[in-house]
């Protein structure tokens, strides 16, 4: 029977059961939560249990541990993460049963059909910028839907179905899937060399993908672009779409002036179009976060959010999971008190920005970094940049590379990176195996009053949380 579909209610009635393969991932779990709230019967499978799967289960989703062909029986649609292999038994069964299979980004695009989409793209800063934009629109009374690649701490979730007409979401350039989206507004924070393995190791293809991303805007759409980034500025100069620029550059339409860091906060004057200005205190450290806030302010101003409401949102922002999260002070067995910061940063540019923020807010402290490189291919491609930026800290402990499914690459492991750093003659890094070993090794490196940054996109975040709760182990302890 042919069914006439007019809105999301019709879709839920016609195709009520949706199954997510790899539901525990940040992007997947957010979409699943929105679809649950819309009224879909959501199920999902994952090899690991985590905060996201437990939250979804508490909201009514049916969560299966591991992958089995039986998991997809009776479902109307299967949504798949880009991390899932083609020979996954659930995908194979869905194909044999002719069940529609949708990549994660394609399902996000479907959700955007029923909202006005704001897509946040860029190599770095997407999660924080998406979160700040959602916060600004919420403070302005627009009640947006949002899907974020990290937990918005104020909401306790990475997604929410709002009652307003706008949907704010991250647009993932890593595999080119952001080209599936059709937003009305697009933000680009920066363009850097990352995930080159998905672009034939050709940065020109990355640049072309971002240009195409803007081309997907309708003629009446808006590109919100950071012109402090040279690559984005070059794109802004030639895109055939309406542009609102932001940055600290005097030429930016929305800009920050008089920028000062005060500990973990930034103070600046927000300059908006038409001569409007607003004093702002941002509840995040670092100039990179000022840029993220400017993107959110630009969108807010464009949608009619009052400048004082923008300022309230930025000052009251509670942060995002694993983005310069202050986990508090921990004492080693020898009595050294250290403050732990947990951060997702895993690219040299991200490390550099976080180090600058740490030094700007805690200039009197020794900067100790525990870093878990993420992917052998990234370590290889960014090897010299990693060596340069990691050489700048006061003390460094490296865990082995988190492979994320990759096979080891000769000369692209943590031991090779440590040798390159030693050759620069500025520091003597310590190398451990698994990130879990950091808890026993770090006390030998730390001194009283240190600021400890624990960074990486792998399982080092769980180690940081464990240390913050349980303390350091290994100084004569089991």
UniProtKB/Swiss-Prot annotation:
Reactions catalysed, as given in the entry: UDP-N-acetyl-alpha-D-muramate + L-alanine + ATP = UDP-N-acetyl-alpha-D-muramoyl-L-alanine + ADP + phosphate + H(+)
GO biological process, one term: regulation of cell shape
GO CC term, one of those recorded: cytoplasm
Protein name: UDP-N-acetylmuramate--L-alanine ligase
InterPro entries, alphabetized: Mur-like_cat_sf, Mur_ligase_C, Mur_ligase_C_dom_sf, Mur_ligase_cen, Mur_ligase_N, MurCDEF_pg_biosynth, UDP-N-AcMur_Ala_ligase_MurC
Species assigned in the record: Stenotrophomonas maltophilia (strain R551-3)
Keyword RNA-binding set for record: no
Cross-referenced SUPFAM superfamilies: MurCD N-terminal domain (SSF51984), MurD-like peptide ligases, catalytic domain (SSF53623), MurD-like peptide ligases, peptide-binding domain (SSF53244)
Function: Cell wall formation.
Cited Pfam families: Mur_ligase (PF01225), Mur_ligase_C (PF02875), Mur_ligase_M (PF08245)
Protein keywords: ATP-binding, Cell cycle, Cell division, Cell shape, Cell wall biogenesis/degradation, Cytoplasm, Ligase, Nucleotide-binding, Peptidoglycan synthesis
Family: Belongs to the MurCDEF family.
Binding-site residues for ATP, renumbered to this chain: 122-128
UniProt pathway: Cell wall biogenesis; peptidoglycan biosynthesis
Compartments where located: Cytoplasm
One of the record's GO molecular function terms: UDP-N-acetylmuramate-L-alanine ligase activity
Family annotation (Gene3D superfamilies): Mur ligase, C-terminal domain, Mur-like, catalytic domain, NAD(P)-binding Rossmann-like Domain
Coiled coil: none
EC nos: 6.3.2.8
């Amino acid at each position: 029977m042919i069914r006439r579909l007019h809105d999301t209610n019709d879709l839920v009635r016609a195709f009520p059961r949706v199954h997510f393969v790899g539901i525990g991932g940040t992007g997947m779990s957010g979409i699943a939560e929105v679809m649950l709230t819309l009224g879909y019967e959501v199920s999902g499978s994952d090899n690991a249990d985590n905060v996201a799967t437990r939250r979804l289960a508490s909201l009514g989703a049916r969560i299966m541990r591991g992958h089995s062909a039986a998991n997809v029986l009776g479902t109307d649609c299967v949504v798949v993460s880009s991390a899932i292999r083609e020979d996954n038994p659930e995908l194979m069964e869905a194909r044999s049963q002719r069940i529609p299979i949708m990549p994660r980004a394609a399902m996000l695009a479907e959700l955007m059909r029923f909202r006005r989409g704001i897509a946040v793209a860029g190599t770095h800063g997407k999660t924080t910028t998406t979160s700040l934009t959602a916060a600004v629109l919420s403070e302005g009374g627009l009640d947006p839907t949002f899907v974020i690649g990290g937990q918005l701490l104020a909401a306790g979730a990475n997604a929410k179905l709002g009652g307003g007409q706008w949907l704010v979401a991250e647009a993932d350039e890593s595999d080119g899937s952001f080209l599936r989206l059709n937003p009305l507004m697009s933000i680009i924070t920066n363009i850097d060399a990352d995930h080159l393995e998905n672009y034939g190791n050709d940065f020109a293809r990355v640049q072309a993908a971002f240009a195409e991303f803007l081309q997907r805007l309708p003629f009446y759409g808006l590109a919100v672009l950071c012109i402090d980034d040279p690559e984005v500025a070059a794109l802004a100069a030639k895109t055939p779409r309406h542009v609102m620029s932001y940055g600290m550059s005097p030429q930016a339409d929305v800009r920050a002036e008089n920028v000062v860091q005060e500990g973990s906060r930034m103070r600046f004057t927000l300059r908006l179009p038409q001569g409007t200005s607003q004093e702002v205190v941002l509840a995040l450290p670092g100039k990179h976060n000022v840029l993220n806030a400017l993107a959110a302010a630009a969108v807010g101003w464009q949608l009619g959010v009052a400048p004082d409401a923008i300022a309230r949102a930025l000052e009251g922002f509670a942060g995002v999971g694993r983005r310069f999260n202050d986990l508090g002070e921990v004492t080693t067995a020898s009595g050294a008190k250290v403050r732990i910061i947990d951060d997702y940063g895993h690219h040299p540019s991200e490390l550099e920005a976080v180090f600058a923020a740490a030094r700007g807010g805690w200039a009197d402290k020794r900067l100790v970094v525990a870093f878990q490189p993420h992917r052998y291919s990234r370590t290889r491609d960014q090897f010299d940049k990693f060596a340069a930026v990691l050489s700048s800290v006061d003390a460094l402990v490296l865990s082995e590379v988190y492979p994320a499914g990759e096979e080891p690459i000769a000369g692209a492991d943590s031991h090779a990176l440590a040798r390159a750093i030693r050759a620069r003659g500025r520091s003597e890094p310590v190398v451990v195996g698994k990130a879990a070993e950091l808890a026993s090794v770090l006390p030998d490196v730390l001194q009283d009053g240190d600021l400890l940054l624990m960074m990486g996109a792998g399982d080092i975040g769980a180690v940081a949380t464990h240390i913050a709760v349980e303390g350091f182990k290994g100084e004569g302890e089991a």
